[in-house]
Amino acid sequence: MSDTKVYPVPDYIREKAHITKDTYEEMYRRSLDDPEGFWGEQAEKFLDWFSKWDKVYHSDLKNGEIRFFEGGKLNVAHNCLDRHLEQRGDQTAIIWEGDDPNNSEHITYKDLHERVCRLANAMKARGVKKGDRVCIYLPMIPEAAVAMLACARIGAIHSIVFGGFSPDALKDRIQNADCETVITADEGVRGGRNVALKSNADKALESCPDVKNVFVVKRTGGDIDWKEGRDIWYHEAVADVSADCPAEELDAEDPLFILYTSGSTGKPKGVQHCSAGYLLGAAMTHKYVFDYQEGEVYWCTADVGWVTGHSYIVYGPLANGATTLMFEGVPTYPSAARCWEVVDKHNVSIFYTAPTAIRALMGQGNEHVTKTSRKSLRILGTVGEPINPEAWEWYYNVVGDGRCPIVDTWWQTETGSILIAPLPGATDLKPGSATLPFFGVEPALVDPEGKELEGAASGNLVIKRAWPSMMRTVYGDHKRFMETYLAAYPGMYFTGDGARRDEDGYYWITGRVDDVINVSGHRMGTAEVESALVLHDAVAEAAVVGYPHDIKGQGIYAYVTLMAGVEPSDELKKELVKLVSNEIGPIAKPDVIQWAPGLPKTRSGKIMRRILRKVAANELDSLGDTSTLADPTVVDNLIEDRPNK
């Protein structure tokens, strides 16, 4: 289909790039042949150590043992702040862009360091110490980054819960991590509307009697309930303490944070990351995958409630002494030009977002993009799901004016940092492909029996060796870690994703392994069918699932969102069926097409396919938890409008 189109590395990028094709091949080979030497060198280059490690790594994936830089001591906040003060204390660390376009703030490294020390001291004054878990439930405001770094400074372990999660989801996460301290705000602001946070936290905390401290940031000044003795105003707490707080010396393997993965059934699954290996992964990939150059402004549009925000808004950029942009708002408020206006306003060089946002903006029309300059842009990135080639082409040609390489990054909450992605100065691009593995990452494709597949092939994506930023365990449940990730293919990490490797060795992620439809014995990745549907000019977005079919075993059920102003019709349905048939083959023709003005998405933009499968199968009494959806009413509309009643 689109495999044949190749975009070579632009000369102007190659000339200044940190990594070229030759250096990539040489460093990649070395990272596999001499991991001890390679990772030791990178840890010296990217991180500042109080004392050096005894052993570079110990890895036994069969038994779930992963350790890097054992015996070494460092502090993550020191690496993100203190070591930069002499050289770049007055440089902007964080540009905060508020929901309201008139609100923005530049925070220097010196200022950020002081804010972090003050909060660290305020937490210590309330009894928070090394190893304690702290729940952060905040909107996208500077205090979120301050809270993360203040925890890291004193060795407390943060657990961020996305500000859009329900009181129930928050309660489960507070209880699972045994948090005694919560940092929240009165309200958040998003798309021109106030979002309740403190009242949600209060509801959650009714079932969490162990929580002793609740720091409350005053964001809007809205009315909130107050519990004396437990609740404390953030601004008062940080004003009462010293701005001097020495960074705790931590072991390389000491936990840095727990982050709960969405979409898992049953009790929450807390992915636990350690200090040194995680920070090395975040810093290296931030510099090399985005080819970050001194003085550039870097903008990752994620929320800090997701791993992308942890690694590529806060830890990676700040470890590298970069200027990182933090955005409180949404891409379509006050208009669909907002992202590009922010790019122009702050001279953003590198822009990293999700395919779902790209498709939404594409559906709004080109004029919102073309009326802005975007001249400062140099590198574009995508994250969160495979990007269909059409959205890739639009992003490349319309947003990037055909001159900015796109780094299509594949990684997971569990991997801590990017594992498969192009490097701007080294990798020729193919729209829709995550391309090649990062240093030290050895991917493989296996069949369901675990037999490794050679050459061009399709199979389950596994990683054959540990890497520094890999999760170390599921918090409080190592058995679950083993069962979920390491038991399926002993000695390898199972990603849960399917992938195809082409004749050039490029990887194409085909979606979760449970996003495979088996039609009359033919296996088909849902991403493939979705890519065919969105080729049609009338289609903004499509989600495809399997459903029980009397004859074929599984049929193909497509939910289709149309571009603004396009009217649904039977004629259009026929066109779409024909298009898929032409693109992939008659076997891939959708059996059911349902027009869907909205799709059920988590707030990080991931489509909840589990819900789509249930609606398609008419299993409406077992939809499961919908509290993490950005807009739960979408589900009611899908149920109401389903053609298979």
UniProtKB/Swiss-Prot annotation:
InterPro entries: Ac_CoA_lig, ACAS_N, AMP-bd_C, AMP-bd_C_sf, AMP-binding_CS, AMP-dep_synth/lig_dom, ANL_N_sf. GO terms for molecular function: acetate-CoA ligase activity; AMP binding; ATP binding; metal ion binding. CoA binds at residues 190-193, 308, 520. Its EC number is 6.2.1.1. One of its GO terms (biological process) is acetyl-CoA biosynthetic process from acetate. One of its GO terms (cellular component) is cytosol. Mg(2+) binds at residues 534, 536, 539. The modification N6-acetyllysine is found at residue 606. Keywords: Acetylation, ATP-binding, Ligase, Magnesium, Metal-binding, Nucleotide-binding. Acetylated. Deacetylation by the SIR2-homolog deacetylase activates the enzyme. ATP binds at residues 384-386, 408-413, 497, 512, 523. It catalyses: acetate + ATP + CoA = acetyl-CoA + AMP + diphosphate. The keyword Magnesium applies. Its cofactor is Mg(2+). NCBIfam families: Ac_CoA_lig_AcsA (TIGR02188), PRK00174.1 (NF001208). Catalyzes the conversion of acetate into acetyl-CoA (AcCoA), an essential intermediate at the junction of anabolic and catabolic pathways. AcsA undergoes a two-step reaction. In the first half reaction, AcsA combines acetate with ATP to form acetyl-adenylate (AcAMP) intermediate. In the second half reaction, it can then transfer the acetyl group from AcAMP to the sulfhydryl group of CoA, forming the product AcCoA. Belongs to the ATP-dependent AMP-binding enzyme family. This is Acetyl-coenzyme A synthetase. It comes from Alkalilimnicola ehrlichii (strain ATCC BAA-1101 / DSM 17681 / MLHE-1).
